[in-house]
Amino acid sequence: MKNNHLILASAILCAGLVPVYSQPGRAPAMPKMSGHMAKLFGGISAYSATMETQSKDSSGDTTTMPSKIFCLDGKTRMETDMAKMKSGNLSPDAAEQMKAMGMNSMVMISRPDKKISYMIYPGMQAYAENPLQDRETTASAADFKVETTELGKDTVDGHPCVKTKFIVTDDQGAKHESVVWNATDLKKFPVKIETVQQGQTMTILFKDVNLAKPDAGLFEPPSSYTKYDSMQTMMREQMMKRMGGGMGMPPH
């Protein structure tokens, strides 16, 4: 088992990405809920929900990722258990290996107000802090213009909805097109979104929607966790701890 962990850790460090799949360097696209996506929520700035993201890449491979999401005034928190992900790109034993190393549970926090993000691994009691470099993520609401076209009425998960085509244009002239199902019994919350992000076609479904404000503490990393200045540093040190138990770095 220790050899398997070493192989997986090496792949992580070489790719610089987590999690690891049968094709190294590929990771599921997680939706960005800021920038043009935030315009799809209208005036709703605080909510929590369970979320299922279905993404299809250019080769036709489909990934389904369940998660929990919390949003408050532009801040976003996503909690994901990789063991629950369904994907043809995930090797059969990768999920179990990630769980054994404390890597299966991930929390991603985006703080546009601070221009930073956190990647947190509760199983490791560690997190990496990274600068938010995506211009769209830190753009203001005034940087986007919205055009809408109503497409009809529909029902999603028991909620009566208005189906609407959104075209959001940013201040650089780039257009982002989405189809949105706004639930009329949830203050027009978008319980279903179809869009394209990072070159992948996405369908995002929201359930158990709660429009109460989440606790502000959810958008901070735990003070007791070890902080790292990059994902690579965190992965390297955590893998050495879990594999070595005092072995130290492998010889060059």
Model-derived regions, located:
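Bacterial N-terminal signal peptides
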Residues: 9-16
